[in-house]
């Protein structure tokens, strides 16, 4: 399963149904990283939403993406190894 980084250590499966595309907001001055990977504008964020059925998440940290960890997640590039697209900080 290909995963995309959200806010550094948090990961989300790269499936459209896991992202609430209807609720994206631009963050002025924030260096967005979404691009075409999730169909979002680079200056927009995606909010991860709970899928309608149980999904197994691969953990890169102890926190599962989106479920109460933070209000919104910036969609990043595919994660390879321990690489973090945000350089380690938001």
Curated annotation (Swiss-Prot):
Keywords noted in UniProt: Plasmid
Gene it is expressed from: yuaZ
InterPro entries named in the record: Put_partitioning_SopC
Name of the protein in question: Uncharacterized protein YuaZ
Highest rank taxon of the organism: Bacteria
């Amino acid at each position: 399963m290909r995963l995309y980084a959200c806010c550094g250590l948090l990961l989300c499966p790269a499936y459209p149904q896991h992202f609430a595309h209807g609720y994206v907001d631009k963050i002025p001055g924030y260096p967005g990283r979404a691009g075409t990977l999730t169909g979002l504008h680079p200056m927009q964020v995606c909010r991860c939403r709970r899928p309608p059925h149980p999904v197994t998440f691969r953990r890169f940290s102890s926190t599962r993406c989106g479920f109460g960890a933070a209000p919104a997640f910036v969609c990043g590039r595919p994660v390879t190894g321990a690489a973090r697209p945000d350089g380690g900080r938001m």
